Amino acid sequence: MYAVSKGANFHPHYFFITFATSQAEILFKDNFEGDAIDNPPKNWAVGLEGLDDSKVIWDPDRPKNRVFSSPTERHDAKGAVYITGKGKGGTDYYVQWEMLYPKDFYMGIVFRHTGGEAFYLLDRRQNTKKLDFWKRQKAKWENFGSSAVLDLEIEKWWSFQLKVSGNDFEVKMKDSEKKTPFAKLKPVLEGSHNEFKKGDFGNYGWVLLDNVVVATELADFSNPWVISPVNSLSTSWAVIKRVD
């Protein structure tokens, strides 16, 4: 379904079509294409102060694609943590994103970040090649979930889906080049914890992030983007169509 936009100055051979797709439940989306190279991403906020060399860079693997290189020194207590700044009041949500591990170390993302060093962590374990869930609070760590041994190859793009629902969390992942829908994949990690009831999504440690989408329903991922660098623009706002 579509509607012709009103009040525009139309060229006789062109008009705008605005698709009537609802994105009311999309809390946040960013593919970093509007950010300046070598600067922090403008749509993100610092959720935890620390050493900060974060910046948007050219994708080392996919030409002409911009990605977020998060602070390289965030290891337990040194570097900054960046958050989306749009999900602080969010209790339940889904997140889809692409992530590249530049080196073999402990790194990943935070969710239900409630401020400072109070958050849940999903990270890649250097010594086990697993994904783990951790709670960080008052400078202490508590593990509450560990996956089987996974590939988790460095310098390679992976696609993730995180489900945050009540006290229960699950993670699905795949090679970013694979077209298999997340709906057809089984979780690689599941865990439960009841400490933090709401909070934001963000980075942890040195990772490259791209095509980050936070939404309240899986249906909202139908077309915020195709999660792919070759088609990472939103097609739901408008298109220009030539009329012969």
Language-model regions, residue ranges each:
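Extracellular glycan-recognition surfaces and repeat-rich motifs
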Residues: 38-74
